[in-house]
Amino acid sequence: MPIIIDKDLPARKVLQEENIFTMTKERAEKQDIRALKIAILNLMPKKQETEAQLLRLLGNTPLQLDMHLLHMESHISRNVAQDHLTSFYKTFRDIEKERFDGLIITGAPIETLPFEDVDYWEELKKIMDYSKTNVTSTLHICWGAQAGLYYHYGIPKYPLAEKMFGVFEHEVLEQHVKLLQGFDELFFAPHSRHTEVHAADIEKVEDLKLLAISEEAGVYLVIGQNGKHIFVLGHSEYSCDTLKREYERDIQRGLNIAVPKNYFKYNNPDEKPLVRWRSHGNLLFSNWLNYYVYQETPYIL
């Protein structure tokens, strides 16, 4: 089934070239189908890139999704044209009286800042508070997951001695949780971050369950309140070349950055990346939508 997006959204062309079924809002309005209403709070600087990454995964399920893009009103985005935000995005004030089946809160490259020093922290707190009663399930990604764990459960983040950067092996800890249906016992996922959360802090909270962890990269997947909150501490949505472009960007800036681990063939940045997380990423998003959104949400929001 398709994802319903604006016919002029640039990501639509990218998805169509990959044979991912999209539908315009005009066509969807003629159908007698209750599509799942999903919002993406896009905190990433390169918004169009993140749109394509997430919509690619969301569009690979049997469910019809009505997509809504959100940005922070209290933050000036410098890496995206204002007319793109005006044309395709809403703010929290625009939607605060609505309800959603699902919400995705993305990462943001600001993890070294204390949460309270982030210029849109107060607005983000309002959105996370809103999600408690107006969203069936919220999926938090990377910094968004750290922010959610901190706001909802008081879990702190800790600085790393060096950037966690690469593709790492993870172990499934809970075999019979719906979010992990179909997962191999060991799977790979990308990470790109300067901070981490500790498993010991999560294990102290009764409402949280640690689902997957990496010996090298640490906590990866946490579930709260039986699926009301999902926290993904990595980037299963990343495209095949995302880490490559991050690495090349940092090299050009003169930063002391290591080659992303377990990513390039022969660990040689002149070789092409090895994609080992695509099937897991698709399964993670599909399971979230099926078990924690579609099967839990009321027909009438």
From Swiss-Prot:
GO terms for biological process: L-methionine biosynthetic process from homoserine via O-succinyl-L-homoserine and cystathionine. The active site is at 142 (acyl-thioester intermediate), 235 (proton acceptor), 237. Keywords: Acyltransferase, Amino-acid biosynthesis, Cytoplasm, Methionine biosynthesis, Transferase. InterPro entries: Class_I_gatase-like, HST_MetA, MetA_family. Its EC number is 2.3.1.31. SUPFAM superfamilies: Class I glutamine amidotransferase-like. It is an enzyme of class 2 (transferase). It is found in: Cytoplasm. Belongs to the MetA family. This is Homoserine O-acetyltransferase. It comes from Bacillus cytotoxicus (strain DSM 22905 / CIP 110041 / 391-98 / NVH 391-98). The gene is metAA.
